[in-house]
Amino acid sequence: RDLDFSSAFALSALPHYQHLVREIGATKMQSYLDNADYGNRSMGGGVDQFWIAGNLRITPRQQLEFLRRLHRSELPFRDTVMGQVRQIMQRTERGGNVFGKTGWAISAEGLHTGWSIGWLARDRKEPLYFATLLQTTEPGDSFLDIRLLLSLEALDQVESQH
């Protein structure tokens, strides 16, 4: 079905992203990765697979730095585009001041990797950035929700100490 970018983001609609990167093309996509200094910048594995089953790798620390740069509009993209991405990332948790994305991948060996990245916007304070990474071979029923819940619990603990 046809989705706008906001809906595709919320649903992690892989076919939408694959169509988008095919439209962008490999050369331009590689330029985006290079200019944004995103992870190891590798597109090995194909233009519509490099971030799924290909060679692109990014550490939690690299993700945090990327989020900081997005939040501060320091990425090499138009300010309007970065603003739209931030708006799409805004979640309803905690009064709508959490911005983030979750993901889940399963390796060929059956390892489930779940993550939650983002930031908590705070009045007149520097945001709290977070990256939560979980791995298991037996994810259970709660794996979908636990990625963000653990992040929010950790943020609550940090907030209570400040």
What are the functions of these language-model segments?
Residues 1, 5, 17-72:
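Mid-domain, small-residue-enriched loop/turn segments at the edges of structured enzyme/sensor domains
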Residues 5-12:
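Short helix- or helix-capping micro-motifs
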Residues 8, 63, 130:
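Active-site SXXK
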Residues 12, 47, 134-136:
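Short, histidine-centered active-site or binding-site loop motifs used for metal coordination
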Residues 13-16, 59-62, 113, 147:
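Catalytic-loop motifs flanking and including active-site residues across diverse enzymes
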Residues 22-25, 69-162:
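Structured C-terminal helix/loop/strand segments within mature extracytoplasmic catalytic/sensor domains
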